[in-house]
């Protein structure tokens, strides 16, 4: 029991209510563990896997996962953390995005212990009367207790009525699924608590909630998001995942390891001690990047990614006289065009943009295709323009 509880709490931000979870575990029955994902984008990224990894831990402990695809709520758009109303997606867009979710999620979860559900199953049959009754369970004042709604209300920014429905529907999902535990990011706490309240209202035992930290993107500043371009998609090519992980700062590396690695706590502490004693952090980063690539693409692809990296950067492929440059970042990072100009690899930012468009720019061996890409503060990268221009750049 104690071991199971420690595994559940490992890496989590908050567990509510621990005593209730202990009582549920004492029953010895497999618990129903719920986590919902709105298919607002077609691909899952490493930020999503913080939750998926914890769900997998529950499976190892013998519990059943309810992976809820919010195809109905996806058409509303989660207002969490937004300072403006989010435009709803069409049914067609949500359905298309949901297709790839099921393929990707089983790279982490065991299909035999996973129940995939869609909240349109019950929400579309609820009807207008049912929706009004659901809305009547809570007040506007209660909704305004949510931090992002309160900020928008105080600054006189509009809050659409349908946005108040989102946490209610997410909470009602827990009623329909009879969830014992619900997982979510720290920014979802209000919505998760709504599930507890509604379960009590409908005469069910309230779910426990487990919040997980939000994973920063490769910029080390903002939450990982495809819209911000700071994400690492689990469907990306092995070399691309490996290269992106190798480009993050050393400080961010430890955050990623803590939230994403399956290595034991003792092994991770050993890495920390070795680095403190003088081991190059790059060695740890290689081991971690290999673990992540192997998880999503298999061990052979991971070994190949390491070999390709070593061939490029550790076996003399790079010039011995490559200049090393320290550059100051802007707002936590440095856009690639400016990095190339300041490193003396191009004549101007316009030239850099042309080189990127022509496929002639690489960072750590990976071709840059987005002129808006940035290198986060604290990262060291090998920048290459054409076949002969190189510089090892550290953004400070």
From Swiss-Prot:
Cellular localization per UniProt: Cytoplasm
UniProt-listed Enzyme Commission number(s): 6.1.1.1
Motif 'KMSKS' region, residue range(s) on this chain: 223-227
Catalytic activity: tRNA(Tyr) + L-tyrosine + ATP = L-tyrosyl-tRNA(Tyr) + AMP + diphosphate + H(+)
InterPro entries named in the record: aa-tRNA-synth_I_CS (IPR001412), aa-tRNA-synth_Ic (IPR002305), Rossmann-like_a/b/a_fold (IPR014729), S4_RNA-bd (IPR002942), S4_RNA-bd_sf (IPR036986), Tyr-tRNA-ligase (IPR002307), Tyr-tRNA-ligase_bac-type (IPR024088), Tyr-tRNA-ligase_bac_2 (IPR024108)
Keyword list, A-Z: Aminoacyl-tRNA synthetase, ATP-binding, Cytoplasm, Ligase, Nucleotide-binding, Protein biosynthesis, RNA-binding
GO biological process terms, semicolon-separated: tyrosyl-tRNA aminoacylation
GO cellular component, one term: cytosol
Domain S4 RNA-binding, chain residue ranges per copy: 334-395
GO terms assigned for molecular function: ATP binding; RNA binding; tyrosine-tRNA ligase activity
Chain location of the short sequence motif 'HIGH' region per the record: 39-48
Binding-site positions, ATP: 226
SMART domains xrefs: S4
SUPFAM superfamilies the UniProt entry points to: Alpha-L RNA-binding motif (SSF55174), Nucleotidylyl transferase (SSF52374)
Function, as annotated: Catalyzes the attachment of tyrosine to tRNA(Tyr) in a two-step reaction: tyrosine is first activated by ATP to form Tyr-AMP and then transferred to the acceptor end of tRNA(Tyr).
NCBIfam families: tyrS
Quaternary structure (record): Homodimer.
Family statement drawn from the similarity comment of this UniProt entry: Belongs to the class-I aminoacyl-tRNA synthetase family. TyrS type 2 subfamily.
Name this protein carries in UniProt: Tyrosine--tRNA ligase
Species this protein is from: Thiobacillus denitrificans (strain ATCC 25259 / T1)
